[in-house]
Amino acid sequence: MADPFAPRTMKRRNVKGLALTPAAPKPPPTAENAPIHRDSDQHAQLEIGIEFNLDLRPEDLEVIKDLGSGNGGTVSKVRHIPTNTVMARKVIHVEAKREMRKRIVRELQIMHSCNSEYIVTFYGAFLNENNDVIMCMEYADVGSLDRVSRVFGPIRVDVLGKIAEATLGGLTYLYAKHHIMHRDIKPSNILVNSRGSIKLCDFGVSGELINSIADTFVGTSTYMAPERIQGEKYTVKSDVWSFGLSIMELAIGKFPFAASEQLSDAESAPAGILDLLQQIVHEPAPKLPKSDAFPQILEDMIQKCLYKNPDDRPTPEELFERDPFVQAAKRTPVDLREWAFGLMERDNRKSHLAPQLSPATADLLRSSDSPTATYHGDDRPLETPTSAYRVDPRRGPAEGSAGLADQVDRLYIRD
């Protein structure tokens, strides 16, 4: 059986005739948020990081819009003018000498060899005139799962299974093939694009970068395993704790630890964070609330991930290969592209700046030809685990459930 995590071959045929310096670059896109999969050329350009090491220069990156910022830096959607490739550019402010920053950039180049369907494509890294570290990577037009959860609420259980499968697949690939631990698993570092692909970003490939910015990301510490908060050694099982916490957050629509509810977005008092970290270390691990929305095998998986003693936790590979919830998720067909379309369509209603789906695409999503046909043209909310999980056999499928009960039944399979 072929190794599912074997790196993709570097000998790829350049079917689109891509060149680093084309004679006539394509004009910039007219729609700022055009879905990736609607342009086959763009899909091919996204593979360019696999075929080439781009000679990235600041003057070749045209900013389309800012995506976010934090203590550690900023992220923008940009267009690489020579290749007309849309990218996500991350500017990281590093407090270090220039030689150390150069070393960080060199360490980041290993990301060129990380070729997996579960990992964002890396285009390159360099230092700008301010000696900031600049990283360019694949742009995910739907966004992070943190944003999806905040805007749309709890994620339904069949999609949650695919998120678990992709996240564990990415963690297993990184460690098995490159001996890299992610070190920062959380919903904001799990991205989704309009093709329905779920991918990891911001993994700990550069030890120097981790050391340089570790003190600037206070929020990340809330996803740290108890052993890391206490200063003990980081292992791949520390990633498993963060994975379990993230999956629970996406399932219930909020951060699982109760102390987090006492922290407002504007509050920066160290006492609030310290109380939360104390709870993570000393209080019992959170559990999924009792609900028909959550199959027992999901509860069991999360419980295994949140054992306080790391020796009791499984590895990402053990979960990916043998956990009943993940195996059931692998067997459950889910149209993630349609799910992603639904999220973007909801966003389109909220902003006149966002592109609208073409009539042909909307008709396709409404038609019975679509595998699950859950797209709605009206304002009905997206299904959540609690609204679409159970079906009364006397009444048949709930309105809008679109076969979700059948998919959840598959998630109960334990063999």
From Swiss-Prot:
Catalytic activity field: L-seryl-[protein] + ATP = O-phospho-L-seryl-[protein] + ADP + H(+); L-threonyl-[protein] + ATP = O-phospho-L-threonyl-[protein] + ADP + H(+)
Broad enzyme group: transferase
Keyword Manganese included in the entry's annotation: no
Region (Disordered): 1-37, 363-409
Protein name: Mitogen-activated protein kinase kinae MST7
Signal sequence segment: none
Lineage, top ranks: Eukaryota, Fungi, Dikarya, Ascomycota, Pezizomycotina
Quaternary structure and interacting proteins, as annotated: Homodimer. Interacts with the adapter protein MST50. Interacts with TRX2.
Domain named Protein kinase: residues: 61-326
Function text: Mitogen-activated protein kinase kinase; part of the MST11-MST7-PMK1 MAP kinase (MAPK) cascade that is essential for appressorium formation, penetration and invasive growth. The MST11-MST7-PMK1 MAP kinase cascade transduces signals from the cell surface sensors MDB2 and SHO1 that recognize various surface signals such as surface hydrophobicity, cutin monomers, and rice leaf waxes. MST7 acts as the upstream MAPKK that directly phosphorylates MAP kinase PMK1.
UniProt cross-references to InterPro entries, sorted A to Z: Byr1-like_cat, Kinase-like_dom_sf, MAP_kinase_kinase, Prot_kinase_dom, Protein_kinase_ATP_BS, Ser/Thr_kinase_AS
One Pfam family, short name: Pkinase
Stated family: Belongs to the protein kinase superfamily. STE Ser/Thr protein kinase family. MAP kinase kinase subfamily.
One GO MF term attached to the UniProt entry: MAP kinase activity
